């Protein structure tokens, strides 16, 4: 793309930011050895009905693929209200917040999904936050997603897998331009 930093880039936040994060996680984590296989996946067709995530979740079930957890990064880069995010999640124009992360998941307090959220938050607080130059605030949300909305973690949950969604506190809307 030959646009400079001032060009409009619809889609960069939903979900270009999530794709960039998945690629960077794969790059960094490829240097280590793990006891289990980690799949770094991006899917298409979320706005058209979770097409890609439904397809892979259904495939995983029919092929008996053991998935321990699904961590969905959807809309994770919007930090400036009015540029990369818009109401209702923004408290005001030009408000900047790169330190708040919301964790959405299905079920009650003891569900596998909420337990996964609590585990991630605890591990972050004990292992990562003390080393972070700018600490993050992780907030476990009570709902599976925003009202009337859905993301790519839902088809995995519907197929019996523990699944959560990470998202920025300042979330995008239809007025985003960056």
Language-model segments: what does each one mean?
Residues 1-41:
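Catalytic-core environment of secreted peptidases
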Residues 11, 32-34, 135-143, 170:
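Extracytoplasmic/cell-surface-exposed regions of Actinobacterial cell-envelope-associated
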Residues 169-178:
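His/Asp/Glu-rich mid-to-C-terminal helical/loop segments that flank catalytic regions of hydrolases
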Residues 42, 167-170:
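Active-site proximal loops enriched in glycine and acidic residues that flank catalytic Cys/His/Asp
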